[in-house]
Amino acid sequence: VSRKLQFRQQGKLPEVWDPVTGRIVPVTLFEQGSQRITLPLTLAPYESKFVVFRAGTPKNQFTGIRSSHADPPLLTYREKEVEIWEEGEFELLKGRESRRIVNRLSERILDGAWEVYFDPNWGAPEKVIFPGLHSWTQSEIEGVRYYSGTARYEKEFTQPALPAGYPDTRVYLDLGELSHVGEVWLNGHSLGIVWARPYRVEVTQFLVPGFNKLVVEVANTWSNRIVGDALTGQKFTRTHIPNTIIRGVGRTRVAWKDVPLIPSGLLGPVKLISLQPVKLAD
């Protein structure tokens, strides 16, 4: 969601603090009223941000952004600029002045087959080719369907050169949906861990024209392995837990064989998103 927020502050400079990454970014798009500061802020599902005000005097900053709908566009603050995550025409406001911008997003889906490596010590084959991304629970292979643990996805792709004349282009890798935690590498460089929407990392620095190799490790919970052990009826199983409590049905205990499988793995769609940041200061 993206909303215009008001704070009872005067004569101070707002900053956005990210409690997950620890990143602190000055807000470069706000309006100082007689008793309040107004600014647009975007939050992903379940996301939290701190808005902190430090001493300082506003200096000729843009005061707002206008779009075709009532709420501000989805945006991310960066140092002296802002990234807009919607296509369309927008108007930056500064007093009686305005600046029209046309925002474009370029998306490329990384479709096709993936090589997926599992831990064979936990019942799955060591390597499976996925023609497309889907939940492990949809697999015809029993060891994959009930797998709990970490799997490594690998994919090679060719990237065209970025268009000339756009030196400030930023490129992000968006993993779509995954369950439950992922870690990303591109061309051998670790890009960090993703565990909440949007499952997105910046790849500008490490994406190269030509051949690229993407690796995503995904880990799920124990639930599916316990369900599988309860269903298969094998003499030797890796777990032996008779029943559990399912959220939303009170304190009634349910046999694990009756518990639904939880979608797991990299679900996608995985895509590269390119955008041009909007400069708000020199």
Task: Label each region the model flagged.
Residues 1-150, 158-166, 203, 271-282:
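Carbohydrate-binding surfaces of carbohydrate-active enzymes
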Residues 6, 157-159, 163-187, 194-195, ...:
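Aromatic-lined ligand-binding clefts that engage carbohydrates, nucleic acids, or primary amines
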Residues 9, 177-179, 207-209:
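A generic beta-sheet turn/junction motif
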Residues 29-31, 191-195:
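Short beta-strand segments within Ig-like beta-sandwich modules, predominantly Fibronectin type-III
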Residues 48, 169-171, 209-234:
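Short, well-structured beta-strand segments enriched in hydrophobic/aromatic residues
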Residues 57-74, 98-112, 220-270:
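Glycine/proline-rich low-complexity spacer/linker segments in large multi-domain proteins
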Residues 153, 158, 201-211, 222, ...:
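Short, surface-exposed tryptophan/glycine-enriched loops
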Residues 194-202:
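A beta-strand/beta-hairpin structural motif
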